[in-house]
Each structure stands twice: as C-alpha cells, then as structure tokens.
Amino acid sequence: MKRAIIYGVTGQDGSYLSEFLLGEGYKVYGVARRSSNDNTARLPISLTNKRFELVQGDVTDPAGIYRLLSSVKPHEVYNLAAQSHVWTSFEQPSTTWDIVAKGCMNILEVIRSMQKKPRFYQASSSEMFGDNFDYDSDGDVYQDELTAFNPQSPYAI
C-alpha cells in the first residue's frame, strides 16, 4: 500500500487531497500544527477512515520532520503548509518566511538524506507571479511555469 504524508492537511487543499488519496487506496498521514482550537473541521471523511492518521507536526521543526519521514517511509510527500494570508505576511514576514520557505527546505533536506527518496510536491500560489501575465495568440491572459516571477509580498516568495 502506498504511503503519503500531507503537511497542511487541515487546509482546504489538504483535506481534498487526503480524501482523494484515501480513495486511491493510500495510507495517509496528515500533519497539522498543534493548535488551541480544533482545526479538523474540513476532515470529517478522512478522520473516519482507518487508513488516515492525523499527526501533530510543524514544517519549522526539522527533527520532527526527520522522525516522521524516517518512521513512515512515505512514497509521496505533499507540502501544503503555509501562512496563507497576504496581509499577515506583511505583519509577520519572519514567521511567513520560516513556514513557506524554510519549511519547504526543511522537508527537502530530510528527503535528501533518505536512502529511498519519496516524490515531493510543493504547493504554491499565483501570487508569486505578482502582476506578470502572458498572453496567448487570442489575447487571453495566462500564467504558467515560464511566466516570470514578480512577488509583491512576503507570502508570494
């Protein structure tokens, strides 16, 4: 059975991804930060599945990432964890950087140290393109992997 770890499982995309992977027969480890409030409202389907395990963890904790990846030995790791409010990124740029940029690096450093490396997916936002857009031959606007980055906030980095 394939095993996947989802950082940021309590967000909208994380909850949808956990349901999808469970439907595909995966064992899913959903990682959520410790919180003073119950942040599992988006997980009613996943929480009732025997192949889903909710794990407390944080992308800013390299030792915790190492322990989890070493014990689970996942086939896939998804990083959807983020400080996802643009305005908050201006108010707390260091915290945003620690979660969005260093958090990704922390996961990648652990993966790099593993003998059998899982596939890795890093979620992002169109905010990284800022006001850069490309146009197709019909004049329609789009952004893709060739669009130049032009972040306008700490969140977008």
What residue spans do the PLM features occupy?
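N-terminal Rossmann-like NAD(P)+-binding domain of SDR-like oxidoreductases, especially those catalyzing
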Residues: 1-157
